[in-house]
């Protein structure tokens, strides 16, 4: 492909996504111009930065294929390029223009299996450790809104206008956590509903942020291992690192579905518990139902499958498939367009 393929990748403060893309492109035998963008904090996003990224996403020649990965940032820019995201909204996801990727990278190391393996049915225990966002002004506002307005907001439609979002940040509006209210609602609902169930242990630990210091990481891992079910409601983006960390430790992620598009490489119904946002009134019962219908053998098998999954995702095969598929699709579309232009008119 030579200079016909350009990949624009935005890294995060924890993860070097550009290196993963370069490795995958090399495995595929694809030559590409990889533009490695530094991490941009949402609070630092400006209209000028959006214009710069939009310029990079403009093909320099008609035959050039451009792929954009904004990292964990929910940046959606329309154009002739193809985007790959970790966070997408079902209401307006276009499979022909964007792809959804898993996020198997973690700051936490994979543990020895023997240290986390279940040998019998675990206790009915659900946990969460992390930022709760209950003190964010827009989260407090979001919780008070009527349910129909909440549902509309959770489709993330306003995020389709990257320049408008950048203007909001540049003007000082604290919009980063505007859609984080389901996290507070889910955690409070579970605590409230399980309060009178003596055999249901719920541990919700708010940290106010993740420092990355050794003690904080060790405590997070300890809480993860102590849990059977791990609450994974969305935060500032419409996905959660915690889902993959739960798989990494062989635990069962409880996903609150807020119009999410989940990566197709994962057998979600087999390995996770998915509860619709409108089902929060029964979140504790949903977890209990899953627990009661799952015997020891099934818990052990599900754990083994989750650990195997993370090993498979660690090979990066899914990124090879995604990039290869995008290139093939774009080539086919270009060839179809060329054929239509060359086809003689029948009179």
Across the structure, where does each feature detected by a protein language model lie?
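Short hydrophobic beta-strand element within catalytic cores of glycosyltransferases
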Residues: 252-256
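"Short basic amphipathic alpha-helical interaction patches in structured regions
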Residues: 141-143, 244-245, 275, 288
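Short C-terminal alpha-helical element
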Residues: 296-310
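Short, hinge-like loop/turn segments at secondary-structure boundaries
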Residues: 250, 271-274
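Short alpha-helical segment that forms part of, or immediately flanks, the ligand-binding pocket
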Residues: 221, 244-248
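Conserved donor-binding/catalytic loop of nucleotide-activated donor transferases
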Residues: 226-227, 247-251
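C-terminal "capping" alpha-helix adjacent to the active site of nucleotide-linked donor transferases
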Residues: 273-297
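Nucleotide-sugar donor-binding catalytic core of glycosyltransferases
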Residues: 2-239, 257-270, 299, 312-321, ...
């Amino acid at each position: 492909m030579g200079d016909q393929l350009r990949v624009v990748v935005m890294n995060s403060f924890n993860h070097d996504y550009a290196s993963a893309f370069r490795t995958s492109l090399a495995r595929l035998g694809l030559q590409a111009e990889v533009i490695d963008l530094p991490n941009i904090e949402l609070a630092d996003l400006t209209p000028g930065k959006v214009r710069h990224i939009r310029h990079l996403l403009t093909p320099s020649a008609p035959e050039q294929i451009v792929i954009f990965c904004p990292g964990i940032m929910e940046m959606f820019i329309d154009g002739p390029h193809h985007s790959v995201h970790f966070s997408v909204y079902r209401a307006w996801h276009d499979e022909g223009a964007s792809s959804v990727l898993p996020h198997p990278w973690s700051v936490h190391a994979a543990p020895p299996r023997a240290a986390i393996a279940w040998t019998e049915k675990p206790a009915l225990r659900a946990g969460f450790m992390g930022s709760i966002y209950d003190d964010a002004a827009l989260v407090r506002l979001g919780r008070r809104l009527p349910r129909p307005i909440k549902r509309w907001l959770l489709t993330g439609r306003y995020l389709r206008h990257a320049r408008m979002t950048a203007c909001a940040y540049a003007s000082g509006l604290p919009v980063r956590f505007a859609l984080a209210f389901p996290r507070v609602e889910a955690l409070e609902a579970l605590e409230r509903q399980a309060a009178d169930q003596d055999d249901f242990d719920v541990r919700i630990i708010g940290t106010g942020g993740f420092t990355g210091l050794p003690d904080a990481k060790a405590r997070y891992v300890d809480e993860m291992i102590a849990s059977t079910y791990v609450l994974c409601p969305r935060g500032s983006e419409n996905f959660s690192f915690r889902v993959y960390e739960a798989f990494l430790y062989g635990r069962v992620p409880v996903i609150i579905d807020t119009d999410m598009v989940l990566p197709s490489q994962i057998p979600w119904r087999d390995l996770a518990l998915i509860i619709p946002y409108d089902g929060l009134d029964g979140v504790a019962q949903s977890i209990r139902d899953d627990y009661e219908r799952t015997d020891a053998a099934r818990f052990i098998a599900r754990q083994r499958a989750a650990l195997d999954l993370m090993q498979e995702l660690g090979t990066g095969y899914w990124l090879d498939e995604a990039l290869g598929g995008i290139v093939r699709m774009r080539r086919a579309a270009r060839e179809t367009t060329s054929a239509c232009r060359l086809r003689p008119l029948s009179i």
